């Protein structure tokens, strides 16, 4: 949720942000009106409550007719106070619900536009020239099946479309990537976590995933719980309703978890292989920090992602995501796109978002510093989305004989193997 003070002091900034997101900016007027009504209702209740307290003191000193009159007023005012309290609570709830529809305030400098208007910040590495090497690259599924690493047929048999099984060396690759990612994250000062994949509605709503992204999450109605699409949800809720001391910050967590996505609206897209699936495992970084340090931490998270991708020798680009494609919670987002040889284009493999104080306000996560208790900032970043990184490894490091070369950084976690050989 955005800072209510900003709605009062600079509603035009909120309108500009909504417009930049491609959203209806007129809703800001509704939120401002609801805020005014809320404050008026709260003031009315507090004023009458103060009068009620004052009556108690006067009754203690009064006698005779005056005391009887005051007692009569006390009975009357009790009902009025209760009514005003109810009205204040209802006005506050209405404001909160409306305010939660507003996206985070877009940071100055974010490219304007929609999904296709992101700006490339940099390009790292050079795609291989397979033609010069004398062979046509195979796609990840053909390679994976030959290596005995991916079984789509049985994954579909077990669970339906967009499911898979990593077998043999495919499973070993995931374990190796997990160990490499966790090793690097530990060097960067992150605390490893294995959080729940099932969360309460408050956690999902607090992170902003029940707004625009609601159709993409799995819900278990009998349990009133959600399957997470990213461990960002559990990591953000980890400190919900807490006050952290400034001396504790920044807090850095890195989690390994399964991720579940309905992929609503993706019918017909990336139907072959494991690029777009309903379940995958992911290593996710999460940071709690002081608001004034959030932009610097965003750049650090991006640098960690770049370090990991570079270690795997995958050519990639960094995209500064456009304002209309940020999602509800992010004020700025950087995506890394890895080179996919058989598609002759870059595809998304990581994402890091600066959510400023947006999620912290919704989850009541604050810090205690010299200026009192205030919301802190939260940031998240993908370190390794397993299926997509495995795709990138298979396609970018395939050899003419059907084998796959293992990047040097990954070899210690695969028993020192330099190549993976086909089994069929």
UniProtKB/Swiss-Prot annotation:
Task: Name the UniProt key words of this record, in alphabetical order.
Answer: Aminoacyl-tRNA synthetase, ATP-binding, Cytoplasm, Ligase, Nucleotide-binding, Protein biosynthesis
Q: What is known of its domains?
A: Consists of two distinct domains, a catalytic core and a N-terminal extension that is involved in tRNA binding.
Q: What is its EC number?
A: 6.1.1.11
Q: Where does ATP bind?
A: 261-263, 277, 348-351
User: Which InterPro entries does the UniProt entry name for this protein?
Assistant: aa-tRNA-synt_IIb (IPR002314), aa-tRNA-synth_II (IPR006195), aa-tRNA-synth_II/BPL/LPL (IPR045864), Ser-tRNA-ligase_type_1 (IPR002317), Ser-tRNA-synth_1_N (IPR015866), SerRS_1_N_sf (IPR042103), SerRS_core (IPR033729), tRNA-bd_arm (IPR010978)
One GO CC term on file: cytoplasm
A Gene Ontology BP annotation from the UniProt entry: seryl-tRNA aminoacylation
Q: What is the protein's quaternary organization?
A: Homodimer. The tRNA molecule binds across the dimer.
Tell me which family the UniProt entry assigns to this protein.
Belongs to the class-II aminoacyl-tRNA synthetase family. Type-1 seryl-tRNA synthetase subfamily.
Q: Where is the composition biased (Basic and acidic residues)?
A: 1-15
General function of this protein = Catalyzes the attachment of serine to tRNA(Ser). Is also able to aminoacylate tRNA(Sec) with serine, to form the misacylated tRNA L-seryl-tRNA(Sec), which will be further converted into selenocysteinyl-tRNA(Sec).
Instruction: Please give the catalytic activity noted in the UniProt record.
Output: tRNA(Ser) + L-serine + ATP = L-seryl-tRNA(Ser) + AMP + diphosphate + H(+); tRNA(Sec) + L-serine + ATP = L-seryl-tRNA(Sec) + AMP + diphosphate + H(+)
Q: Which molecular function term from Gene Ontology is one that the record holds?
A: ATP binding
Instruction: Give the subcellular location.
Output: Cytoplasm
What's the main place this protein lives? cytoplasm
Q: Which domain of life is it from?
A: Bacteria
A Pfam family: tRNA-synt_2b
The pathway this protein participates in, as annotated, is: Aminoacyl-tRNA biosynthesis; selenocysteinyl-tRNA(Sec) biosynthesis; L-seryl-tRNA(Sec) from L-serine and tRNA(Sec): step 1/1
Q: Where is this region: Disordered?
A: 1-27
Q: Where does L-serine bind?
A: 230-232, 284, 382
Please give the name of this protein: Serine--tRNA ligase
Source organism of this protein record: Cutibacterium acnes (strain DSM 16379 / KPA171202)
């Amino acid at each position: 949720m955005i800072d209510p003070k900003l709605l009062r002091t600079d509603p035009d900034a909120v309108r500009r942000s909504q417009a930049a997101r491609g959203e209806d900016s007129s809703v800001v007027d509704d939120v401002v009106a609801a805020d005014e009504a809320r404050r008026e209702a709260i003031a009315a209740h507090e004023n009458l409550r103060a009068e009620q307290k004052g009556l108690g003191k006067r009754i203690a000193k009064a006698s005779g007719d005056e005391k009887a009159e005051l007692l009569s007023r006390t009975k009357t005012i009790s009902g009025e106070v209760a009514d005003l309290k109810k009205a204040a609570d209802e006005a506050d709830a209405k404001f909160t619900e409306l305010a939660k529809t507003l996206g985070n305030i877009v940071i100055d400098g974010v490219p304007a536009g929609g999904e296709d208007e992101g700006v490339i910040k940099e390009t790292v590495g050079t795609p291989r020239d397979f033609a010069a090497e004398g062979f046509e690259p195979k796609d990840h599924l053909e390679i994976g099946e030959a290596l005995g690493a991916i079984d789509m047929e049985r994954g579909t048999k077990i669970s339906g479309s967009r499911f898979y099984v990593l077998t043999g060396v495919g499973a070993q690759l995931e374990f190796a990537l997990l160990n490499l990612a966790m090793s690097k994250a530990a060097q960067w000062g992150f605390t490893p976590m294995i959080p729940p994949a099932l969360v309460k509605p408050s956690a999902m709503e607090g992170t902003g995933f029940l707004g625009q992204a609601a159709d993409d999450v799995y819900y278990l109605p009998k349990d009133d719980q959600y399957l997470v699409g990213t461990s960002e949800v559990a990591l953000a809720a980890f400190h919900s309703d807490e006050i952290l001391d400034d001396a504790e910050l920044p807090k850095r967590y890195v989690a390994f978890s399964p991720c579940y996505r309905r992929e609503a609206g993706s019918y017909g897209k990336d139907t072959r292989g494991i690029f777009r699936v309903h379940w995958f495992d992911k290593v996710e970084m999460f940071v709690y920090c002081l608001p004034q340090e959030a932009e610097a931490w965003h750049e650090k998270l991006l640098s960690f992602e770049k370090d990991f991708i570079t270690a795997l020798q995958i050519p990639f680009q960094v995209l500064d995501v456009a304002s209309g494609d940020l999602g509800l919670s992010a004020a700025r987002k950087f995506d890394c796109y890895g080179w996919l040889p058989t598609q002759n284009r870059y595809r998304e493999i990581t994402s890091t978002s600066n959510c400023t104080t947006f999620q912290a306000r919704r989850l009541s996560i604050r810090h205690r510093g010299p200026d009192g208790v205030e919301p802190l900032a939260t940031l998240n970043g993908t370190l390794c989305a397993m299926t997509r990184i495995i795709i990138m490894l298979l396609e970018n490091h395939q050899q003419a004989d059907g084998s796959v070369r293992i990047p040097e950084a990954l070899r210690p976690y695969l028993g020192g193997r330099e190549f993976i050989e086909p089994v069929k």
